[in-house]
Amino acid sequence: MVEDNRDSADSLRLLLGLYGYEVAVAYCGHGGVRAAQQYRPDVVLCDIGLPGLDGYAVARRLRQNPSTAKARLIAVTAYGRDEDRRRSHEAGFERHLVKPVDPDDLRRALDCPTVLN
């Protein structure tokens, strides 16, 4: 997970733990790219408004790297306009969830590999 707000990251980490996921957290875009390259996760939850490297750039970098290109990318962000969703899709995100995230929506996004932006 890539989330610069530590309270949000902690809350999501606890929820994901209840769902049975192992979670590594990075608090900035550059750290998120490094962590994904190191851990090679199946799923990456990523905020858009990150310091240094925004979530769109994180997604593009992960898609371009063979070791992370197949990870499922889910945007978890306060950016909820149609334009934000379009940019997420273009950057490589498969899903776009708007904060505060409904736990049921998150669970569906994690369980369903189909693109349902």
Predicted features and spans:
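Two-component/phosphorelay signaling modules centered on CheY-like receiver
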Residues: 6-24
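C-terminal output helix
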Residues: 101-110
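The feature encodes the CheY-like receiver
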Residues: 51, 69, 81
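Acidic catalytic/metal-coordinating carboxylates
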Residues: 4, 28-31, 54-60, 102
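Active-site beta3 strand of CheY-like receiver
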Residues: 39-45, 50
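Short amphipathic alpha-helix used as the core "switch/output" element in two-component signaling
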Residues: 34, 56-69, 110
